[in-house]
């Protein structure tokens, strides 16, 4: 083995899945990968499944907390820093890679206090709190979207690490002579505004113009969403979740979804046109900024939730369904914006700082 690498990522799949892609790349290069996380995040399930040792510290976010929590915060941060320092001393990593989540704050500080090179990666077009703070002390800064951190000699625009199977190489079935295929993604929990909006919007389209629909509605909302389609007399297949995203992307001609960083990067990787409805209450409105990356180049249509009703969505769908060549152009533009070497580039940067 060439030494230990400590990856810090926690909370949501948007942080953990790109970090897992980097972990696999480190392993192929002969490094032993360890993971720093918390007991409350999705990493508790996914990291052991990947066969990686998981080290836990106690840390949580401060935004939106009450006064009592804020008073306790300095002591809790000190505790989490001491926990992270102990883990760093035990592992003696040759590099620490922070991929987002609250865990990266104390973990990144512990790494720098120990003199270990620290590389951070920001998945969103707007940097999270921990990464904004760590950018001041990080050895290198990786960003998925251009100019997230402004001008800095330490900054590199790498794109988001995504699963290699999403870079689809097989040509799509021609759109001529068949119904287009619409994939609706509500995320693992389901986006209820999308679950309500799509049946109503599709009901406004003439029957002959309606696409095939596969709608991932979330476990809690799948049954009621299917009922909405039936009530609207719109044919659709509704599922609580999708296990094989590569297959789903390969099936689709158009995607309607939120604008999480990983989703936006996956759409580009798959070369898919999209209608993006950013989560309106996302921290710092980062989903709107993510969506703009594709929309400003013509690879996506940005639809703010507050300004999008069934009639507006139906009009947007009518425009592309009556002019299918637009979908081909949007998809080609999305693929041009993809960064297929993102995972390798992030790991290359880590190796650069290891060598000093």
Swiss-Prot record:
MF (Gene Ontology): UDP-N-acetyl-D-glucosamine:N-acetylmuramoyl-L-alanyl-D-glutamyl-meso-2,6-diaminopimelyl-D-alanyl-D-alanine-diphosphoundecaprenol 4-beta-N-acetylglucosaminlytransferase activity; undecaprenyldiphospho-muramoylpentapeptide beta-N-acetylglucosaminyltransferase activity
Membrane topology: Peripheral membrane protein
EC number from the UniProt entry: 2.4.1.227
Top-level division of the source organism's lineage: Bacteria
Class of enzymatic activity (EC top level): transferase
Keyword annotations: Cell cycle, Cell division, Cell inner membrane, Cell membrane, Cell shape, Cell wall biogenesis/degradation, Glycosyltransferase, Membrane, Peptidoglycan synthesis, Transferase
Residues annotated for UDP-N-acetyl-alpha-D-glucosamine binding in this entry: 12-14, 124, 163, 188, 242, 261-266, 287
Keyword Zinc in record: no
SUPFAM superfamilies: UDP-Glycosyltransferase/glycogen phosphorylase
Pfam families linked to this entry: Glyco_tran_28_C, Glyco_transf_28
Disulfide pattern: none
Main location: membrane
Catalytic activity: di-trans,octa-cis-undecaprenyl diphospho-N-acetyl-alpha-D-muramoyl-L-alanyl-D-glutamyl-meso-2,6-diaminopimeloyl-D-alanyl-D-alanine + UDP-N-acetyl-alpha-D-glucosamine = di-trans,octa-cis-undecaprenyl diphospho-[N-acetyl-alpha-D-glucosaminyl-(1->4)]-N-acetyl-alpha-D-muramoyl-L-alanyl-D-glutamyl-meso-2,6-diaminopimeloyl-D-alanyl-D-alanine + UDP + H(+)
Intracellular or extracellular location(s): Cell inner membrane
GO biological process: carbohydrate metabolic process; cell division; cell wall organization; lipid glycosylation; peptidoglycan biosynthetic process; regulation of cell shape
Gene Ontology cellular-component terms listed: plasma membrane
Family classification: Belongs to the glycosyltransferase 28 family. MurG subfamily.
Record-linked HAMAP family: MurG
Role of this protein: Cell wall formation. Catalyzes the transfer of a GlcNAc subunit on undecaprenyl-pyrophosphoryl-MurNAc-pentapeptide (lipid intermediate I) to form undecaprenyl-pyrophosphoryl-MurNAc-(pentapeptide)GlcNAc (lipid intermediate II).
UniProt name for this protein: UDP-N-acetylglucosamine--N-acetylmuramyl-(pentapeptide) pyrophosphoryl-undecaprenol N-acetylglucosamine transferase
Species, as recorded: Ectopseudomonas mendocina (strain ymp) (Pseudomonas mendocina)
């Amino acid at each position: 083995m060439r030494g230990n690498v400590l990856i810090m990522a926690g909370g949501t799949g948007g942080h953990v899945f790109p970090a897992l892609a980097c972990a696999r790349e480190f392993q192929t290069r002969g490094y032993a990968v360890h993971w720093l996380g918390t007991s409350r995040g999705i990493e508790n399930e996914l990291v052991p499944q990947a066969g990686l040792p998981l080290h836990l510290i106690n840390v949580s976010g401060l935004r939106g907390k009450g006064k009592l929590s804020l008073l306790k915060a300095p002591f809790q941060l000190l505790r989490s820093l001491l926990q992270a320092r102990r883990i760093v001393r035990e592992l003696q990593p040759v590099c620490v890679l922070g991929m987002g989540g609250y865990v990266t704050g104390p973990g990144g500080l512990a790494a720098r206090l120990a003199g270990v090179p620290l590389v951070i990666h920001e998945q969103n077009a707007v940097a999270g709190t921990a990464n904004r703070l760590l950018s001041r002390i990080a050895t290198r800064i990786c960003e998925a979207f251009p100019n997230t951190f402004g001008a800095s000699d330490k900054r590199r625009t790498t794109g988001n690490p995504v699963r290699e199977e999403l870079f689809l190489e097989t040509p799509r079935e021609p759109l001529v002579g068949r119904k287009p295929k619409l994939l609706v993604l509500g995320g693992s929990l389901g986006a209820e505004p999308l679950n309500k909006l799509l049946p109503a919007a599709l009901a406004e389209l003439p029957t002959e113009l309606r696409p095939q629909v596969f709608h991932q509605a979330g476990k809690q909302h799948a049954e009621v969403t299917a009922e909405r389609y039936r009530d609207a007399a719109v044919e659709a297949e509704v599922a609580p979740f999708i296990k094989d995203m590569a297959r789903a992307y390969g099936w689709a001609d158009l995607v309607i979804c939120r604008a999480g960083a990983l989703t936006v990067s996956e759409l580009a990787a798959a070369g898919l046109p999209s209608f993006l409805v950013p989560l309106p209450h996302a921290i710092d409105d980062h989903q709107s900024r993510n969506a703009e990356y594709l929309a400003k180049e013509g690879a996506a249509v940005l639809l703010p939730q507050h300004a999008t009703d069934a009639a507006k969505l139906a009009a947007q769908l009518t425009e592309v369904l009556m002019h299918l060549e637009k979908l081909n152009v949007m998809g080609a533009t999305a693929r041009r914006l993809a960064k297929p070497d993102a995972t390798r580039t992030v790991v290359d940067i880590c190796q650069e700082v290891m060598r000093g």
